[in-house]
From Swiss-Prot:
UniProt keyword annotations, A-Z: ATP-binding, Glutamine amidotransferase, Ligase, Magnesium, Metal-binding, Nucleotide-binding, Pyrimidine biosynthesis
Binding site for L-glutamine: 54, 354, 382-385, 405, 462
Protein residues bound to Mg(2+): 71, 141
Annotated control of activity: Allosterically activated by GTP, when glutamine is the substrate; GTP has no effect on the reaction when ammonia is the substrate. The allosteric effector GTP functions by stabilizing the protein conformation that binds the tetrahedral intermediate(s) formed during glutamine hydrolysis. Inhibited by the product CTP, via allosteric rather than competitive inhibition.
Binding site for ATP: 14-19, 71
Gene behind the chain: pyrG
Subunit structure and binding partners: Homotetramer.
GO biological process: 'de novo' CTP biosynthetic process; pyrimidine nucleobase biosynthetic process
NCBIfam families per the UniProt record, alphabetical: PRK05380.1, PyrG
Binding residues for UTP: 13, 188-193, 224
Protein name: CTP synthase
Annotated family: Belongs to the CTP synthase family.
Length: 532
């Protein structure tokens, strides 16, 4: 029988529900239990694929091509599992499915309502994930904050699941904030009490309360929370700001959170063996070197827009015993005139993925600087496309060369639409998405990084390198070092006469893990260290 854990949040959003859920998942997996995890998002968008990164942070792509919430990245990195489209559920998806069923006549003329039709569809998404994975435990994080109008159907659905499967098979975790009032020198539990009161008014009694705090939580304060929220003091778990996120599972284990969970769910399992994880955290806290990477993008004011890229850089740094210092460089402020001054202190330059024409020339200026000055360069998706545009302009001398996405009327469309994309009208869910194979050319930097000639990586793009320019590029020194297995699509390019200049069409950041860094990131950071 699958057991169900639901993680809710109160007081404020962005409180760390995702990290809590992922960390608990890691502990339970290390106790020998099979775990899957999903995120419920109350927004009406079908997925975050067309949302601005300023609204929602990065869009995380799964193997099967789902465009999902960035929390799925935390889940995959912490638990080391590959999730799928059933791991992210939105109000938009649920309402679309219910309306489709109504139009088909599935409800036999009945009045379609939030209860039971929307709540039943939500419950089915939980039970479907359990059936598909046959996991011992499924953890479901509910996005938003208790009290939000949008969250009410989700909370009602998870309340009903307790009756559907039995109280011994369901556990509720509520994460809240204990603010520190600096002027008074006090921490306040009242917001937590009110948040739990709101949750209980909806029929959900939390079994565990995780309190986010800057300061240590005293036993007296835990006793007070336990008294007013009707749980044991041992079930109040402190979650303080950590030097590294990867210490959170160890902090939860120290407070016996996994023991409490298993006791509630009437499960027996051996203690979690966390030696490898402890070694990872020790390594992260004791890095002996530093390397500075210039990340050039247009969304740098919200670093969550590049969350997986930043994490993949850090993973690579751990492998090299190096702390990664990221210079968040706004590409809108980069010009040919100031690029040398902006880049003077960086050891490597990375241009990540993106869409649209804003701040493109700043990225191209950064790429030219990296190429000319032999600074290690790593381009991802748009960063690969612009590397070929820069090369076409400044090495091949093709004046006005550009991407058809940015300049549809360009004479030299170095980057153009995939043929199968030309008649597509909808933006959402129509990109080339998910895991695809790539064949790597022997004797290249890409092969040296991977140590093999066939890899699989996750993609998210609509435009592709135009093969009409391939021969010219290669003759001038830009090597096509990986393609799709049929040779049709260019996947990786690199420069022959450069210490390390590699750019890929796919998104390698999505498969990086803290204890298993992605190969191109690892070699890029190594090259940046050699450039110090």
């Amino acid at each position: 029988m699958t057991k169900y854990i639901f993680v809710t949040g109160g007081v404020v959003s962005s409180i760390g529900k995702g990290i809590t859920a992922a960390s608990l998942g890691r502990l339970l997996k290390n106790r020998g239990l099979s775990v899957t995890i999903q995120k419920f998002d109350p927004y009406i968008n079908v997925d975050p694929g067309t949302m601005s990164p300023y609204q929602h942070g990065e869009v995380y792509v799964t193997d099967d091509g789902a465009e999902t919430d960035l929390d799925l990245g935390h889940y995959e990195r912490f638990i080391d599992i590959n999730l799928n489209k059933y791991s992210n559920v939105t109000t938009g998806k649920v309402y679309s499915e219910v309306i489709k069923k109504e139009r088909r006549g599935d409800y036999l003329g009945g009045t379609v309502q939030v209860i039971p039709h929307i709540t039943n569809e939500l419950k089915d998404r939980v039970f479907r994930a359990a059936r598909m994975t046959n996991s011992d435990i499924i953890i479901t994080e509910i996005g938003g904050t208790v009290g939000d109008i949008e969250s009410l159907p989700f909370l009602e659905a998870i309340r009903q699941i307790k009756s559907d499967v039995g109280a011994e098979n369901v556990l509720y975790i509520h994460t809240t904030l204990i603010p520190y009032i600096k002027a008074a020198g006090e921490m306040k539990t009242k917001p937590t009490q009110h948040s739990v009161k709101e949750l209980r008014s909806l029929g959900i009694q939390p079994n565990i309360i995780v309190v986010r705090t800057e300061q240590p939580v005293s036993q007296e304060m835990k006793d007070k929370i336990a008294l007013f929220c009707d749980i044991k003091a041992s079930e109040v778990i402190e979650s303080r700001d950590e030097e590294t996120l990867y210490n959170v599972p160890l902090s939860l284990q120290k407070q016996k959170m996994d023991d409490i969970v298993l006791e509630h769910l009437q499960l027996e399992a051996p203690q979690a063996e966390m030696t490898d994880w402890k070694n990872l955290v020790h390594r992260v806290k004791n890095l002996s070197k530093k390397v500075r990477i210039g990340l050039v993008g247009k969304y740098v004011s919200l670093q969550d827009a590049y969350l997986s890229v930043a994490e993949a850089l850090r993973h690579a740094g751990y492998e090299h015993d190096a702390e990664i210092e990221i210079d968040w460089i706004d590409s809108e402020k980069v010009t040919k005139e100031n690029v040398a001054e902006i880049m003077k202190d960086v050891d490597g330059i990375l241009v990540p993925g993106g869409f649209g024409d804003r701040a493109i020339e700043g990225k191209i200026a950064a790429i030219e600087y990296a190429r000319v000055n032999k600074v290690p360069y790593f381009g991802i998706c748009l960063g690969m496309q612009l590397a070929t545009v820069e090369f076409a302009r400044n090495v091949l001398g093709l004046e006005g060369a550009h991407s058809a996405e940015i300049e549809p009327e360009t004479k030299h469309n170095i980057i153009d639409l995939l043929p199968e994309q030309k008649n597509i009208e909808n933006m959402g869910g129509t990109l080339r998405l998910g895991l695809y194979p790539a064949r790597i050319k022997q004797g290249t930097k890409a092969e040296a990084a991977y140590g093999t000639t066939l890899v699989e990586e996750r993609h998210r793009h609509r435009y592709e390198f135009n093969n009409e320019y391939r021969e010219q590029m290669e003759e001038a020194g830009m090597i096509v070092s990986a393609t799709s297995p049929d040779g049709r699509l260019v996947e990786v390019v690199e420069l022959a006469d450069h210490p390390w200049f590699v750019a890929c069409q796919y998104h390698p950041e999505f498969i990086s893990r803290p204890n298993r860094p992605q190969s191109l990131f690892k070699d890029f950071v190594g090259a940046a260290l050699n450039n110090k």
